[in-house]
Amino acid sequence: MNIKPIGERVLLKPIKKEEKTKSGILLSSKSSNTDTKNEAEVVALGKGEKLEGIKVGDKVIFNKFSGNEIEDGDIKYLIVNADDILAVIE
């Protein structure tokens, strides 16, 4: 599937949270909160003016409860508005 965001939207691939502690203890998916992590990699950008400073490959922090989830096989993506991106991780 080839997904191209339109306007002020961004296609994100969420980054899964580490599923074990620093000491090596494995966590269950419920205790690790993998569904609520709000960091992602930018996969594609629309052509909106608000997207200045964001590029494909950037890691970003986005509003936790924003966007629409899309699945392509086993991979989950989010389409979010540019206003829902809070910061770029350097």
UniProtKB/Swiss-Prot annotation:
Q: Which InterPro entries match?
A: Chaperonin_GroES, Chaperonin_GroES_sf, Chaprnonin_Cpn10_CS, GroES-like_sf
Q: Which UniProt keywords apply?
A: Chaperone, Cytoplasm
Which superkingdom does the taxonomy of this entry point to?
Bacteria
Instruction: Identify the Pfam families for this entry.
Output: Cpn10
Gene Ontology BP, a term: chaperone cofactor-dependent protein refolding
Gene Ontology MF terms: ATP binding; metal ion binding; protein folding chaperone; protein-folding chaperone binding; unfolded protein binding
Location comes to: Cytoplasm
| SMART domains per record | Cpn10 (SM00883)
Q: Name one GO cellular component term.
A: cytoplasm
Q: How does it assemble?
A: Heptamer of 7 subunits arranged in a ring. Interacts with the chaperonin GroEL.
Matching entries from PANTHER family are given as: 10 KDA HEAT SHOCK PROTEIN, 20 KDA CHAPERONIN, CHLOROPLASTIC
Q: What does this protein do?
A: Together with the chaperonin GroEL, plays an essential role in assisting protein folding. The GroEL-GroES system forms a nano-cage that allows encapsulation of the non-native substrate proteins and provides a physical environment optimized to promote and accelerate protein folding. GroES binds to the apical surface of the GroEL ring, thereby capping the opening of the GroEL channel.
Q: Which family is annotated?
A: Belongs to the GroES chaperonin family.
Q: Which HAMAP family match?
A: CH10
Q: What is this protein called?
A: Co-chaperonin GroES
